[in-house]
Amino acid sequence: MIKINLQFFGGRGASSSGGGGGGSAKGELVLPNGSKIEFEGELKYGGKDATLTKEARKVIEAWEEKRVKNKVEYAYSVMEDGTPVGAEVRGGTGSVRSPRSYKQDGATFTHIHPRGDGMLGGTFSKADMDNFANNPAKTTRAKAKEGAYSISKTDKFDTQGFKSFVSGANSKFNSSYKAKEKSLATDYKSGKIGYDDYKKGVAKAFNTALVELHNTYSSGQKQYGYKYTLEKSEK
């Protein structure tokens, strides 16, 4: 039996991009340490999430840079003046549960999306997005090796429409990845490709599905009343 664990972090319920301009990475992303992440398509970056206050951003970014290289998820929350909402919370390799107090009205909630070499940390899972929609915190972030994903509500936020949109996007994500993984598994079992090529192909397929999901989230901003971006890392 072939099994490679490419769990979508936050998928079990993470409670609930650095740089200014946009730009994109096409086909691969080269990290500051020289390692490469391969995918099909275009990973699109945006500007800074303007919803965050200067005070909140200073505290949030310092915490994200401190924790982004950890191998398990951590969560943290601050108010608009930069005051922390309780202590950070340590999770596991695929999720982190944080207290409801983290989701206070106007708060910014952030957590870490770690993943292994050759893999994108990835955008928000359906669980992340459901928590964002159902709680009063204004902004939710996920810091990954490729940057910081950030989503904020506007005064036109459509909770139910957004949740339906996210559900459809994640169904497409799952079906797209699973179809490619099944094809690769068939090729491996038949001897058409070796195990190393199978692993590399699965990683690329997963990254590709994550890029597609990210770009889909970006496309729904105006219709459902939210701001979404991937901020480039400055370090």
Report the location of each language-model feature:
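Glycine-rich short-loop/terminal segments
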Residues: 9, 13-105, 183-185, 189-235
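Generic marker of residues within folded, mature protein domains
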Residues: 67, 130-132, 154
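Generic domain-boundary/flexible-linker signal
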Residues: 31-32, 120, 151
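Short acidic-glycine loop/turn motifs at beta-strand connectors
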Residues: 78-84, 144-148, 152-157
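Sec/Tat signal peptide C-region and signal peptidase I cleavage site
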Residues: 3-8
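Short HxH-centered metal-ligating active-site micro-motif
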Residues: 83-138, 144-147
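Compact, glycine/acidic-enriched structural inserts
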Residues: 154-178
